[in-house]
């Protein structure tokens, strides 16, 4: 790869549901496998007014369904770096990713720090085991019936879509491509990030147990904290307000902003005991 970002159309990749040109910081939001930018509409609405969400639309879905999907985390990250260049050239950019999006956010942050000398304001990784752990099992290689059973198990997709053959025909290719990207991603050890990292997870997530999410602490030399919420892999769906408050507070505190609502990173619950996970080294 060259040091120069790809030439991509930011308008295709980035959706600004609540534009805030004078925001203190912008948070790039990267969706899960099969997800889209619209998943973050509520997220964008609930964030602190000084934090603007830039929601990423991967190719191969919704208004980009005619485009081929990208099937690797690294390729997705390269395109996100290029699409967000107008904002990271200004500074004041942070990243949030859920599941597949967490891996893409991590790789994007690594490219910015190591190739472009840009330190993100923060990295927020949700519902994803640390990249240094063993790869996921290869769900994307299952037949349709077994693949859909796995989708149902995670409870993140409206059952009406899974029972509609026409809709399935439209969304299955993107789902499989995204799962392939997530499951074939191999972490290549390199210098740690220096930006603050906050890991978020549901306390009953079968794909991202809390002890494995906590291993994200090994991937930054900067501040780290872990926040657990009640729920499974898609714990976000019922707790947008609390999650947005926690992220806004953490982001504004780590930036030293005077209008943050709290002065400490949030506390997480692990195995029933309250523990703080800031710089646990």
UniProtKB/Swiss-Prot annotation:
Q: Which residues form the active site?
A: 99, 233
- Name any one GO molecular function: hydrolase activity
Annotated metabolic or biological route of this protein: Antibiotic biosynthesis
Q: Which InterPro entries match?
A: AB_hydrolase_fold, PKS_thioesterase, TEII, Thioesterase
Q: Where is this region: Thioesterase?
A: 26-249
Report the protein's function: Involved in the biosynthesis of 12- and 14-membered ring macrolactone antibiotics such as methymycin, neomethymycin, narbomycin and pikromycin. Responsible for removing mis-formed acyl moieties (aberrant decarboxylation) that are bound to the PKS and could block it. Catalyzes the cleavage of methylmalonyl-[acp]. It exhibits some acyl-group specificity, and catalyzes the cleavage of propionyl and butyryl derivatives faster than acetyl malonyl or methylmalonyl derivatives.
What family is this protein classified in? Belongs to the thioesterase family.
Cross-referenced PANTHER family, in alphabetical order?
Answer: S-ACYL FATTY ACID SYNTHASE THIOESTERASE, MEDIUM CHAIN (PTHR11487:SF0), THIOESTERASE (PTHR11487)
According to UniProt, the name of this protein is Thioesterase PikA5
Give the organism the record lists. Answer: Streptomyces venezuelae
| Taxonomy of the source species | Bacteria, Bacillati, Actinomycetota, Actinomycetes, Kitasatosporales
